[in-house]
Amino acid sequence: MHPGFNAKKFPDKPAIVMAGSGKIMTHGELNALSNQGAQLFRSLGLKPGDSIAIMLENHFLFFPIIFAAWRSGLQYTAISWRLQPSEVEYIVKDCEAKAFITSKFLEDTAQNLNASLSNVSKFMLDGPSEGYESYEDAIREMSQDPIEDECQGGSMLYSSGTTGRPKGVKRQLTLNPLPYQEDDEDTGLGRALLIYGATEESIYLSPAPLYHSAPLNFVTGFLAQGCTAIILEKFDTEVALKAIQDYKVTHSQWVPTMFVRFLKIDPSIRTQYDLSTHQVAIHAAAPCPVAVKEQRIEWWGPILHEYYAGTEFNGMKIINSEEW
């Protein structure tokens, strides 16, 4: 669904909740901020089919920027903030980004890129930095109305580079005009989640770094569906369990290493949390050891859903707990 429609239907409903700080962004605010971001991109001369790159921690403004690019018809590349400056530089240049957005948290890396990205519009969140314009100041002057030529963009993510340099997974953008009404054709961001029973009432927990393929695409999809996304700034087993309990989480996404860490929790601590609202726990990214998955199903029940796809998304297989 279009963020503008969600903003009209339930403007005051939480769209994003940061589990650590408790900061909340409503669907109305998400729509307004992403409109301002889209206006900024057009003011920079970015047109449908152009690219931007973002390198951010799990930041409060991560998804307003993503939706700004999406509704502008741009291709957006999320970059791991754990990479070395030379690796970040390679990806920014390889994806042909015309704008690069990062944060004060990553200022050291950002400053190492200053000279090499001289032809790229550079923005910094959370404060000024030499060579970088304040993103918040830049959008503050922009209209909260939609741009006139809204069309559908999409992500261009990179492989891990295990056989050389990271390789961009570039899909042809449809650049379809975006729908505004409930009965218009769904653009696909939220549609894929219907297989997991997602509705606008779902509460989704995202515990992983947002630059990864699954967190990026799942959170975007749940937000497009009109859901609420609970985002962990950093993964912690007890913080995750508390978030499921406190926010009445219905859906979540994990990787096997998180499962292993969960199993190290003392059994007496496990039973302290009410996880009864948790309906679907999705996992992927790597093979899950059989013994680990058996113990996870024993603890959480048959709510685990595994899929095989990867960043390339060249085929997708899904299996639930009963089939497994």
For the regions a protein language model found, what residue spans apply to each?
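Conserved AMP-binding/adenylate-forming core of the ANL superfamily
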Residues: 15-59, 63, 84-89
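A short N-terminal helical cap/helix-turn-helix that marks the beginning
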Residues: 1-16, 32, 154
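AMP-binding (ANL) adenylation modules
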Residues: 5-9, 44, 57-60, 209-210
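Conserved S/T- and glycine-rich ATP-binding loop of Class I adenylate-forming
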Residues: 52, 69, 100, 159-162, ...
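ANL superfamily adenylate-forming
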Residues: 108-157, 165, 171-189, 266
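A short helix-loop-beta submotif of the ANL/AMP-binding
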Residues: 51, 57-85, 93-99, 113, ...
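Conserved AMP-binding/adenylation subdomain of ANL enzymes
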Residues: 177-207, 211-251, 265
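Gly/Ser/Thr-rich phosphate-binding loop
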Residues: 155-157, 224, 249-254, 263-324
